[in-house]
Amino acid sequence: MDAMPEYSLFLVRILEELDTKYSTVSYQDLCKSLCARFDLVHLAKLRSLLFYTACLDPAFPATLFKDKMRCSVEDQQSKKLMVAADIVTMFNLIQMNGGMAKDKLPMGPRPKFHKNQSFESCRSDTDVYKYNDNDRAYKLLDTRGHHVSRNSPKSDCNSCQQFIPTSDPNFLLGVTKDLKCRAASLDKLQHLPQYASVSPPPCEMQSTYFPMDIDSESTTDQESLHANPGIKDVYVSSGEPFTVHSCVQKRNIFKEDFHNLVAFSPHVITTECRANPKSGGNYHHRRELSKPPTFFNHSFELPYSNPYFEPVNSPLQNKGRVKHESLDDLQASTYFGPTTVSECVSNRRTSSKHGRQPAWPVKSLSLNTEEGPDFERSFLNGKVPKDNHRHNIGTMENDQHFQCAKDKPTASPSGFSKKSNGSKTKDMSSVACGPGIEKREVGRRYKDKSINCPSFQSSNVDNGMSVGTQTEQHESRKVKDYPSQNKFKERPPFKHSEEDSEIVSDNISDIFRFLDDMSVCESLGVVQPSCYNSNGSLSQVTKSDGDSSPERNTIKIGKTGIKLDRLFQSLENSDDELKESVCKLVLRIGEIEKKLESLSGVRGEISQVLSKLTRLDEKIQEPEVNGKSSDGGLVEQIKTDANLSPHVFQCHTTGHNMKVEKSPEWCCSEADGSESLRVKALKKSVFTRRSSRSLNEENSATESKVASITNSPRDWRTVSYSSHNGEEGKERDRHSEGKERHRKSREAERQYEAHQGHRSSKPPKDSYLVEQVFSPHHFPPTVKTHVKGSPLYTDLRLTGHADGKRSQPSWTIEEYKRNSGDKNKLSALDLQVQESLNPNNLEYWMEDIYTPGYDSLLKRKEAEFRRAKACKIGALIFAAACTVILVIVVPICTMKS
């Protein structure tokens, strides 16, 4: 291992080793190479510097590396390997997400270096001589290609690189095969949040640096700055606007406005690329295709990340920063690092220069290892100022060498596309398509897709990535009219390139309209985002009763939104695109209708069930008419009331006319509630009279009920009634007459059936609703007998008695006395029979529904209970026999003997 006179040069050597090998050597081999060539002391120092530099980025996972720094391993070789692995990992992480740290640090303008220019031209004469004496392997050249001598004038370094503090991450990141930089000190800027801004710490807290001479090691940054007069003269003569004089000034620079500092563009414009940009692009393409998949991920690579600045990109010269660019920094920041939007902004400004080579594309930050066209570049090229259309021509000319990867089948960016229902959706790059070839390529890619998937699923859209693509779509359309497309005549002309581009743009508009609608609907609490696609239409309804939910209204809103969007688009588009849009709209409506057909079957089933329930009410009333003449008039009255009831309303679930007399759990409206509840109460009072019948009659009624269900051919949907407002007065009279007649007949029968009159003949609406709510029955009658007798369900048995004894409130003194007297005469069996025969209770309709496993479980528990009971009885008998024998027989025998 070569001995180096400077730590800074030594670290440059290590970083050069990393940069030259990480694209061609695997991760394990790179770690082994570092362990074999460098000492643990230097590796540990570099690891510490990399860690503190990476900590400037808030997206850096510092906790993963912090514990390892404190770890003390006995084996030096394993410790060396661990440190080398951390260096390689952090080096690539910093290369990927170093943009945040670059934005936060104060920087001055730096001139660009070409590939054939050495970093040593900025070195002082003394250092150059030292270096030449120790290591003859490096040829030190100045900017004009001459050898550097001791007596070189200071003006030779005027165009050299300025002073860069090693706290700058560019010092650690910017070293590539051909570009190297040096520094005089290494400040630990991570100590910033630990001290108050009023009383800064002494400079000794920042004494981690690389001295110019190992023998004369200075202790402060001040000494390191002034250790060599040649270096000082270089800084003074260069006219550097930002010169560090003390730690206090270095602290205070962070309180100033960073936006007024000069920005930079992280790419290298070499002499070869400047002379022939196309060849430079081909070189970059060959480099990218030759990258092996063995090392981490290709997303870690930022080729030619340059620490030097371009003064043409200063925000002082261009104040037109968009407000949401700072928001893009936050939205694009992920666990693996931000997407360096500030670099994209500077690239966007420099791309307007005619004939200038654009920036190297930023890699995709996805974890996908496949190569593909750059999403970031297409995103930032999609926003073009209105007054810069002439500059787009040069951008399109220089973009062509990035397109050769798109013609290969392996170049599809699978990180930005998904599959759903067997058909591929549109590429994510179509959301943020830029001008030029990319837009035409995206249009062709869109045209190749099947027409069966015209909508772009909203789950594939990232709101942060789509910023700024909608507002400039008209300007991006105009770009294709320029004659710069003659550059691409080697490709066959597209037949529908214009219409395809507009289709893609319209789809972008649909996405943004969908997002706006979603924000409005979410504030209202109506729409569930997973049910809707980008056109605002229903993608899938998972509920069978979707029509009764608030989504029914949003379906209509979505359909009308589709029609309005298509109508507005048809005013702008050509006839061919209008036809295509109409075809897609018809197909989409057909898909929606097919999805809604499944709901129509559910509607039919519900309507049939309700019609059979209505017929069941009528069938149950027939035995009462034939059996008891005293109830005949009342039943007839109820039937006439039911047939002539004017209260018909539109059912929310089925969309058909429906009587209110059905159970109000299905449909209950405020306007029709009072009349229907009266009729329902009259029906209930009739059903309570059947409690004195035997269980055989109940079984026969059940059989007749089942027969009526199976034999009723009439569809409920064919039943319709007309509403007449003039009959309301007559119906009220009928109700009052029915109540009086029912009260008289009940008074006559009270002496024979005293326990039957416990229910009031005037049930008000409130009490009826209270009974419906507070009298739930969870088990059918076939199971309730087991439940009431089982010791495992004592709580249910108690609540069953409580529910059975709860009756309607009494509104007069007579009813109160009568009900209080009748309650004591009721038995549990009568209550159970009454509840099972009451159609207002759930168990009336759940009578024949049971679970065989539940019955077998109850039978098993009952058998165990009986067995335990028999064992107890046997034990008691045995104990009694033993007691008798011991107490009576034994004394008698002893007395006789």
Swiss-Prot record:
The chain crosses the membrane at residues 873-893. Residues 405-433, 450-502, 688-766 are annotated as: Disordered. GO terms for biological process: negative regulation of cell growth; negative regulation of cell population proliferation; negative regulation of neuron projection development; negative regulation of protein ubiquitination; negative regulation of TOR signaling. Keywords: Cell membrane, Membrane, Transmembrane, Transmembrane helix. It is found in: Cell membrane. It is a single-pass type IV membrane protein. GO terms for cellular component: plasma membrane. Residues 411-423, 452-471, 697-724 have a biased composition (Polar residues). Residues 472-498, 725-756 have a biased composition (Basic and acidic residues). Its main location: membrane. Pfam families: MINAR1_C, MINAR1_N. Disruption phenotype: Mutant animals show no gross developmental abnormalities. They have enhanced fear-evoked freezing and compromised C-start responses. Mutant brains exhibit up-regulation of mTOR signaling. It comes from the Eukaryota. PANTHER family: MAJOR INTRINSICALLY DISORDERED NOTCH2-BINDING RECEPTOR 1 (PTHR31530:SF2), MAJOR INTRINSICALLY DISORDERED NOTCH2-BINDING RECEPTOR 1 MINAR1 FAMILY MEMBER (PTHR31530). Belongs to the MINAR family. Intrinsically disordered protein which may negatively regulate mTOR signaling pathway by stabilizing the mTOR complex component DEPTOR. Negatively regulates angiogenesis. Negatively regulates cell growth. May play a role in neuronal development. This is Major intrinsically disordered Notch2-binding receptor 1. The lineage of its organism: Eukaryota, Metazoa, Chordata, Craniata, Vertebrata. The gene is minar1.
